[in-house]
From Swiss-Prot:
Protein's UniProt keywords contain Nuclease: no
Location(s) in or outside the cell: Secreted; Host cell
Organism lineage: Bacteria, Pseudomonadati, Pseudomonadota, Gammaproteobacteria, Enterobacterales
Subunit field text: Interacts with the chaperone DspF (DspB/F).
Regulation: Polyamidoamine dendrimers inhibit channel and virulence activities.
Function (record text): Major virulence factor that may function as a water- and solute-permeable channel dedicated to creating osmotic/water potential perturbation and a water- and nutrient-rich apoplast in which bacteria multiply within the infected plant tissues. Expression in Xenopus oocytes results in inward and outward currents, permeability to water and osmolarity-dependent oocyte swelling and bursting. Acts as a major cell-death inducer during fire blight, a necrotic disease affecting plants of the rosaceous family, and during hypersensitive response (HR) on non-host plants. Essential for pathogenicity on host plants. Contributes quantitatively and in a strain-dependent fashion to HR elicitation in non-host plants such as tobacco. Induces cell death in leaves of apple, a host plant, and tobacco, a non-host plant. Also triggers necrosis in the widely used model, non-host, N.benthamiana and in yeast.
Entry's free-text remark on domains: Secretion and translocation signals are located in the N-terminal region. The N-terminal region is required for interaction with the chaperone DspF. There are probably one or more DspF-binding motifs or domains near the C-terminus of DspE. Folds into a beta-barrel structure that resembles bacterial porins.
Bias kind Basic and acidic residues: ranges: 1-12, 110-120
Species name: Erwinia amylovora
Compositionally biased spans, kind Polar residues: 91-103, 407-418
One GO CC annotation: host cell
Induction note: Transcription of the dsp region is positively regulated by the alternative sigma factor HrpL.
Protein name: Type III effector DspE
Phenotypic consequence of gene deletion: Disruption mutant cannot cause fire blight. Mutant is severely impaired in its ability to induce electrolyte leakage in apple and tobacco leaves. Transposon insertion reduces the ability of strain Ea321, but not of strain Ea273, to elicit the hypersensitive response (HR) in tobacco. Mutant induces fewer necrotic symptoms on A.thaliana leaves than wild-type strain. It is unable to multiply in A.thaliana leaves and bacterial numbers decrease rapidly after inoculation.
Amino acid sequence: MELKSLGTEHKAAVHTAAHNPVGHGVALQQGSSSSSPQNAAASLAAEGKNRGKMPRIHQPSTAADGISAAHQQKKSFSLRGCLGTKKFSRSAPQGQPGTTHSKGATLRDLLARDDGETQHEAAAPDAARLTRSGGVKRRNMDDMAGRPMVKGGSGEDKVPTQQKRHQLNNFGQMRQTMLSKMAHPASANAGDRLQHSPPHIPGSHHEIKEEPVGSTSKATTAHADRVEIAQEDDDSEFQQLHQQRLARERENPPQPPKLGVATPISARFQPKLTAVAESVLEGTDTTQSPLKPQSMLKGSGAGVTPLAVTLDKGKLQLAPDNPPALNTLLKQTLGKDTQHYLAHHASSDGSQHLLLDNKGHLFDIKSTATSYSVLHNSHPGEIKGKLAQAGTGSVSVDGKSGKISLGSGTQSHNKTMLSQPGEAHRSLLTGIWQHPAGAARPQGESIRLHDDKIHILHPELGVWQSADKDTHSQLSRQADGKLYALKDNRTLQNLSDNKSSEKLVDKIKSYSVDQRGQVAILTDTPGRHKMSIMPSLDASPESHISLSLHFADAHQGLLHGKSELEAQSVAISHGRLVVADSEGKLFSAAIPKQGDGNELKMKAMPQHALDEHFGHDHQISGFFHDDHGQLNALVKNNFRQQHACPLGNDHQFHPGWNLTDALVIDNQLGLHHTNPEPHEILDMGHLGSLALQEGKLHYFDQLTKGWTGAESDCKQLKKGLDGAAYLLKDGEVKRLNINQSTSSIKHGTENVFSLPHVRNKPEPGDALQGLNKDDKAQAMAVIGVNKYLALTEKGDIRSFQIKPGTQQLERPAQTLSREGISGELKDIHVDHKQNLYALTHEGEVFHQPREAWQNGAESSSWHKLALPQSESKLKSLDMSHEHKPIATFEDGSQHQLKAGGWHAYAAPERGPLAVGTSGSQTVFNRLMQGVKGKVIPGSGLTVKLSAQTGGMTGAEGRKVSSKFSERIRAYAFNPTMSTPRPIKNAAYATQHGWQGREGLKPLYEMQGALIKQLDAHNVRHNAPQPDLQSKLETLDLGEHGAELLNDMKRFRDELEQSATRSVTVLGQHQGVLKSNGEINSEFKPSPGKALVQSFNVNRSGQDLSKSLQQAVHATPPSAESKLQSMLGHFVSAGVDMSHQKGEIPLGRQRDPNDKTALTKSRLILDTVTIGELHELADKAKLVSDHKPDADQIKQLRQQFDTLREKRYESNPVKHYTDMGFTHNKALEANYDAVKAFINAFKKEHHGVNLTTRTVLESQGSAELAKKLKNTLLSLDSGESMSFSRSYGGGVSTVFVPTLSKKVPVPVIPGAGITLDRAYNLSFSRTSGGLNVSFGRDGGVSGNIMVATGHDVMPYMTGKKTSAGNASDWLSAKHKISPDLRIGAAVSGTLQGTLQNSLKFKLTEDELPGFIHGLTHGTLTPAELLQKGIEHQMKQGSKLTFSVDTSANLDLRAGINLNEDGSKPNGVTARVSAGLSASANLAAGSRERSTTSGQFGSTTSASNNRPTFLNGVGAGANLTAALGVAHSSTHEGKPVGIFPAFTSTNVSAALALDNRTSQSISLELKRAEPVTSNDISELTSTLGKHFKDSATTKMLAALKELDDAKPAEQLHILQQHFSAKDVVGDERYEAVRNLKKLVIRQQAADSHSMELGSASHSTTYNNLSRINNDGIVELLHKHFDAALPASSAKRLGEMMNNDPALKDIIKQLQSTPFSSASVSMELKDGLREQTEKAILDGKVGREEVGVLFQDRNNLRVKSVSVSQSVSKSEGFNTPALLLGTSNSAAMSMERNIGTINFKYGQDQNTPRRFTLEGGIAQANPQVASALTDLKKEGLEMKS
């Protein structure tokens, strides 16, 4: 065979193929489609066949000259060499012999040059190189255009520039062609594999044989050389040279580098392809190119450029020549300002650095051929103490022992010895291991596991290649220095010597090999105490020693309940066997000899040193041997950190090195080779991109800008209509959640390398309910999280509908008819209109409209869809981004189905995968331009600027401002002939207050109709019947009616529970029930209630309790109905619970004063429906036990569906009560809010519309709707957008009394009252869509004030009075009176506000229609209210008071406009310029609110005691005023003056807000039954942390209980773990999850409520208060030292103990326009007691709320900082005594950072924390560094 390289104008290719001595393998391929190394790696590792085989080059016995012997060169595999661009010059004329040589230089010739020839060629430096290194980076060859190139040679380069550019483009195509050929070899033997048991890993990288890639050409061109690379038939000479080289290496093996000892230069990974000439014509250049690219890991082949690290005054100094990305990461970790170093030591070659800081941390920085790593010692506390005393320190390394000596003090007498970390430690970090010297494998060959496959690193290309397809695990280096791994979990292999053990029957759980090759194997048997000792790996079975491990101490056996020891990991060292049991404790014994018996007594090994440093709850998770063969234990402490702890001479393991808090960067070229086609990419918008390839889910990492694997063994990936991604895996449909938080960060000082960053990794959530794994789903079509379809293995299409907000099916799963379908189904889809499509394997498409498959109509059948005309077969049917069907044919053509026909479709070009600035971020930035303010350094306070001009507010944001004329029309005066807006609003308010809302008329009518239905029900059912539950239990409707009977039972239970909840609400409102739902024995009916209600003409006067009791007694839902007992108690207790009349008089339609009107109507509806279900059960009884046929069941089904779907589910009373409404007034308030925003958005002259269009820069409603929709869809987690509109009016006045002259200054009292109303609409991102909230607040405020002032101008002018400064220069009759007035005022304000709001969730597919209806007015308010799911109504009140003071200095000039001496009124015009200052002296507030929905309610209470100095402000103004002053007299004596002025001004003000508020929020929600998903997740967690055999057996048996219900499985788990001793935080957390589910199931069984979220929140406008107490708190603490620590005090202590946390909070505190919230929660033990007490009915909301008043019961849950910006415009019209205001605003808020704390058994100190929001994103420097690393093929372990 020959490999020929042919350069042409169009393409060139080089193909090197792998050769396997045993069988044919896949060709090793070389090349790149771009300058990115990962692309090269993807091609090199595309196939898993023979990837580990290194090149086998057949070298001739003579050199190229034919005379001298050939020398084997240790040089890099060079693409330049393959292309011949280094040796040969430009083509000679065709007549020259050199160009017509028939054979040419072979690849063997190129790589076998002698040293002399190589040195001779060194005179000709490299040509200009195309590289991906850090020095010069180019995206494509076009980047070379225009750059000067220095060419060598004596003559001038004659090649035209255009021709060179064309050749450069050819080179790019050539590289792409090479990689394509290497990624998809055409060899027929590509699939061959080794048949040997151990994987054959090539003995050398010279074992790859060259094979041809194509035909050769005999023609030559002017700009291309033809090089023929031939293969010799006889390779015996090469084999001889190869064996000689191996022999030399065995005799003199290279030694690993040691600190302090001169180290020979070793081969090192170079993460880039060897530089190549940019054109094949440039091979003769002799002048060095000015381009000097720098690789991340420097060096050329054998050279290693070490890191340059020094110290300067204790600070880390990194040389600029270091890789920039690595410098960045080191500066962000070791180079922090808080880090101070005392000593530094470097190895001779600079590959290793040791740094000792003043906290006792010793850092080891190591550069190897494949990675960088930085780690530190495990326990710095002891060293820190010595350094603190001495003040100085030193570091030295013993060259013989390799021990690190740490000295403290100037003389360094006090030394601490520490074993330095070796290659074994770093291999544990990176997973990369090297073969030792003397093995069958090449020394230093790198090997690793990836996706359970062995991968070998190509030494020249630096690319990982798969060795074979066998599954391996537990790769490690053992005490003999060899590498071992498990094959298929049953065979132990020595990878270094290619030896294997026999295949065992049981799986191998753990193994160990000592220095002499003796092997210990622990098998994964049920008892876990059986193991084998083998003299060697390949020893005969007769020589094996089988052992049974037992406790040597009988007391240990009693403690464990058996004598056998359950081993989890095993190690042998120096003749002793050491094991760690399932509790992580150590035992040891001497290794027995053959014939000593099978029972081995194991003695406990107490680890006092580990207990002292890590606590008693540490666990031994495994063992390993270090570079010196010393045994180390892998110790996991309670902070989830793993430590390598060496075994000392005292038989104790001692703290060594922290393997968790480390910085690890390793080469991953070749491991990830994902390059999906555009149609395979799922665009998730701001969340990134996803792709599914070969069953593995990948995501485009926005941090590294590359594809990364996430989930394996996946069946399908699709995007639901709701915009979320869904995954079909293991027969289950799971919604993908895109990660938005960082990984856990340890709390404390051991988090040096915690670089907060979020990767947009998709994580599967809980499986959607309904689908069974046994169905083995093959395809899915998802509408949303509550509705989806699945194609089962049997070919059935099943639809599932889940009740929103629950994990329960709303309807039983429906199997669709297959009528009309021919062929075997392959896939299913739904389009944007929810039409269903089915694709068969034969390429046919069938469809059903939405109405047919959703209604389950029996007559509905499938219709075959006519496909577009095409000669090729249909390949696939997909959905576009807009969810429209796209048919793709095998010839590549595509057609889209739209408007009922197929149309040719051209896929849009794929945009950049990297997510740029989102639409929401763009809008936020624009809003930031319109606000002015700054954080006062060191204070945490933001000073804000506001300004207004002539009554127009929002003048400070001139960059984002609407036109003046538009603002006048929107806020002040609309010049039309229609009725003025204020008059219309007042008229509408009066009308709606009287007769309600026209859109709610169906509800009003239904309320009246239900009263009549209840009366009719009591007439029909006047005699008691058997309870409904018993009736249904006795029915037998046969096979056809089984499903109907189950539906009736489920509906009965739903009705009874709904009625019970309603009667509980009514009882609590009346006071006959307590807040916990129990009977209130102290209840006494109000004696005057009946009299008061008699005046209400809307009330019927009938006793609703008696009517309901009669109805329930006649048609009871169950034998022991709680509903019936409570109604009976209502009657006996004398509860007078009347209801409205059936016909409301005077056109009012409803009783607006009934606070529970809707709840009463819901109770009546439930009661009447129970009676009707009774009647249906009686009808079913007629055919029961008679095997009813299908027609009879069909009739019953129709009647049942009519009752449930039309008369109950579609009832407006049910709709609105499910939203949480209890009375009409709250519903009408929210209706008003919705209607207000429909009017606001559809009218372009409205203030809300104007402000929104201004911010979004849109014109007209259509563009507004489009931009608003796109912006809302781009909202990220923690972001929200709000719109508000407010208006108000008030009356205010002052009185200037005439005082005695003895009073030096005037005293001016004043008062005012203001009415205001505000409407709010907000959108916020939530899981699964957007939260939408409409709200209306209305309030009244009153204020009183006292002011004074004095004119100081007379003192300046020498006049006696102010009148003396008057001037008549303008007019003698109208004098101008100047004055300079100093004034001050004190005011008090009291404000009350009523709050109403409605919140619900919209999925992304519902948003466009919602926005269109809102902005165009095509939807009514009632229709908008019905949109979405999970509605929650909120109603509350707020009362605030404040005392403020102000001072001002005004220079004024006034002119008297009336005649002198005119009485009693004087008219004055005045202009002034002034300065003002204000301060809030005291403020307090009280707030209450209740949020109710279908599944629970939340109460919030806020009692904020008076706080002082909550805000200050300063301003300046220019004012023009006009007014009248009325002089009042009494009996001829002046009493005072009533002034009334109107003014216009230009003003600006600075203000800061220092207020703090607190609130308690408690949620009680309906408990849901535990599901199989809950059990599956729980058992997985328990099995991970409890590894004893009893638990393992129990969990395995639990999985086999197919028929067991989740509640039964939960009971088994509870019984098993109730007796378990919980030691360690992970076990504590697992058992805590079990207890939560137990309480939840108990609450569900008893139909009780469970405690949901419960928190105490403190909100700060002054961010410095997060960790610093205010004056009031300090005073309280001073007078009462026993007070518990406040949240600020606790956070301050956390920050002092954790520098990383301190840096994060300090960064958050520097954010302008932000506020902070600190949330506290109940400690676990107290919460568990509270949950049980609620379940037992012992406590209610009030009792739970009391627990939050004692902060000893609480722990810090989270700290959150949010930033908000707003654009507000409006107009204020102060006119004499009456003033009005009108404004609109658009605002956005985003989560700057949230710190969530996680606790273990210690409830006072958090174990770890996670970050969310902006602070969680990697800072730009780190992000850039990680991206650069990825480009070099390196990745940081996170």
